[in-house]
């Protein structure tokens, strides 16, 4: 039976075909010397057979403040070489420097201008108070552009162009002191959309972590919030850092950090604006649990025939380590992979049959502590 158009979320799901019982990149890896707290988030792209990883390195104290954005490459997904530091934060902890902490490097190729763009988050940082979470606040999304044209310019160097999204008079009511905590652009026809996130970190405990959409006619912007659609109803409590992949039938899948234990979340869309209720994909089972907490996916890499590599970050499991009063685990962050397949049900089951307990809006799963965030 031929597929004549995009399938609904009820007709497809991700299946893990192979798990790995250890991380592919950790503080023990060659090239990670001096990285105190490990790795978190970012994006992986595959270019001419080479995997390029742009990730956040939590190199020193203050935790989640003194950061490097780094570029790594691999030929086989398992063995990695550090190419260099793309950006480094100041580590200022007074609340005055708007680039005190840098997070979430997202490389995106602009075919129209034939250049790689790098989007990343810059935060102010200060000690928390009993009422506010200030470790990362007033996030602003920066756009940088490779100075080298063409696909081979992915390694940069990158020139900062300016801020494309931040909290201000045009913010939606659900956005808060955290500012803009993530940004991922993807193209739909002649228009660009971007997932972006925020939370009201001005009041503890933090009740919701949400995402919305922004739109632009060019990757460089200007970007405008899709206020009538926001916040998106993919998750009811917690969603961060969605990364979008276009599927072969023209539809879209987003993978993201969710509150479910040992899992990441994912959602489908036929048009890039209307997204299905979240489903969960367990990436750690049985003896393959190396992380005490699965955190942020770094995207899906299309390996052909509806198979993908899913990269994700997690806090390594270390005996005797526990979360602090804010739900933060200080064990080093590492990066892992699973092989996945997109299962397409052409007969079309009902929504409840297809999603079932995989709907991450269902009750249960890990609780979302006051500061259980994934920058």
Feature locations, PLM:
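Short glycine-rich, acidic/polar surface loops and turns
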Residues: 296-299
């Amino acid at each position: 039976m031929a597929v004549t158009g995009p399938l609904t979320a009820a007709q497809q799901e991700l299946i893990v075909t192979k798990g790995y019982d250890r991380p592919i990149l950790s503080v023990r890896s060659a090239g990670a010397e001096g990285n105190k707290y490990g790795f978190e988030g970012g994006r992986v792209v595959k270019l001419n057979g080479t995997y390029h990883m742009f990730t956040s390195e939590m190199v020193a104290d203050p935790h989640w403040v003194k950061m490097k954005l780094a570029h790594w490459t691999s030929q086989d997904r398992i063995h990695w070489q550090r190419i260099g530091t793309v950006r480094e934060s100041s580590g200022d902890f007074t609340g005055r420097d708007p680039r005190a902490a840098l997070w979430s490097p997202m490389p995106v190729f602009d075919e129209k201008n034939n250049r790689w763009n790098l989007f990343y988050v810059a935060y102010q940082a200060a000690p928390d108070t009993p009422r506010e979470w200030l470790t990362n606040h007033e996030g602003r999304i920066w756009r940088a552009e490779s100075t080298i044209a063409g696909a081979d310019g992915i390694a940069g160097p990158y020139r900062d162009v300016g801020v494309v999204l931040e909290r201000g008079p045009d913010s939606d009511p659900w956005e808060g002191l955290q500012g803009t905590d993530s940004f991922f652009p993807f193209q739909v026809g002649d228009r660009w959309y971007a997932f972006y996130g925020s939370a009201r970190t001005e009041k503890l405990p933090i009740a919701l972590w949400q995402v919305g959409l922004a739109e632009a006619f060019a990757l460089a912007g200007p970007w405008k919030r899709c206020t009538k659609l926001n916040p998106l109803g993919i998750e009811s409590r917690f969603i961060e850092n969605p990364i979008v992949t276009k599927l072969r039938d023209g539809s879209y899948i987003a993978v993201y950090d969710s509150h479910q234990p040992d899992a990441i979340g994912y959602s489908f869309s036929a048009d890039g604006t209307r997204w299905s209720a979240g489903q969960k994909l367990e990436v750690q089972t049985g003896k393959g649990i190396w992380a005490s907490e699965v955190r942020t996916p770094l995207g899906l890499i299309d390996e052909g025939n509806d198979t993908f590599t899913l990269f994700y970050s997690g806090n390594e499991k270390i005996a005797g380590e526990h979360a602090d009063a804010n739900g933060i685990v200080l064990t080093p962050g590492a990066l892992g992979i699973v092989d996945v397949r997109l299962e397409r049900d052409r007969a079309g089951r009902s929504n409840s049959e297809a999603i079932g307990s995989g709907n991450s809006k269902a009750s249960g799963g890990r609780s979302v502590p006051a500061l259980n965030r994934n920058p």
